[in-house]
Amino acid sequence: NSPIMMFTVYTCIILISWIGAKMIVVNSLTTGELMSLLTYCMNIMMNLMMLSMVFVMITMSIASAERICEVLNEKSDITNPENPDHEVTDGSIRFDHVTFRYNKTSDTPVLDDINLSIASGETIGIIGGTGSSKSSLVNLISRLYDVSEGAVYVGGKDVRSYDLDTLRNEVSVVLQNNVLFSGSIFDNLRWGNPDATDEQCRHACDLACASEFINRFPDGYNTHIEQGGSNVSGGQKQRLCIARALLKNPKILILDDSTSAVDTATDAKIRKAFAEEIPNTTKLIIAQRISSVMNADRIIVLNNGVVDGFGSHEELMETNAIYREVYESQTQGSGDFDEGGAK
């Protein structure tokens, strides 16, 4: 509507000026009166334009409000059981013949007959090609989705028996593209634990190798972070998010390709700190780089939603063709996992 309105305004100005000029020539209108007339007309036209914009905004607001109400009124399929458990005893995980579909009517499962047993405190690497359902696998642990068949057990109990808040408070997830909020570094860290002391925040940052760059800031931990973390690098953002997750003191820590923007030396320091400082926390590390998982206790190789291999680095090098192919491609300077192998 803006070009049409502007065309109308300028057309009115031209007509008033043209007619007014003729009237001035025959002395039926003064120059001052013409200028006043133009000013009044401009004010009227501008107010009409504002009014039309208000109507447009109201229409857009009503449509947005309807969509928001639809989301707020949506009922979640995942709810608490009648008598939920409020304590997760340890970080052990077991997948018992788990099959999962995003669409219940789909014939092809995303995960098919997964059987895994992970002891509390183990460090487990997970690798696989794009679309091999690595993230889908770990999302079942905190009940972001429910299994289609089988069951997932945490601490020896079916995850569906837990209170949702209790379960999710014991599972920390660090994604590849996490979010930082506007505020100081301390403020961002305390999203993981509002009651954390300054010393606990500093210790978490030491484990995540974030203190290395924080101490170089003039304001240290009081440095202001812009919305979305736009004033820190990708690697710095990932390390802050890892520190934030550690502050929850979870029984299960999931790192979903969360060190992809971190150099290999820093990545190794973080993994070493995890092994020494949080030995009782079960750690699941999803990665594309073999170097990020090769020192894990065991490694899961996923291929098209099926466990293709599960064992230590040495065992998989001997028995699993996909793992061996990716390892060889990366040690020769290639890089990323692709469907069913290396790219």
For the regions a protein language model found, what residue spans apply to each?
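ABC-type nucleotide-binding domain
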Residues: 10-13, 80, 86-343
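Helix-loop-helix
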Residues: 1-66, 71-72
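Flexible, glycine-biased helix-capping/connector loops in cytosolic signal-transduction modules
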Residues: 20, 27, 74-77, 91, ...
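Conserved E/DxxT/N motif and adjacent residues on the DHp alpha2 helix
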Residues: 70, 77, 190
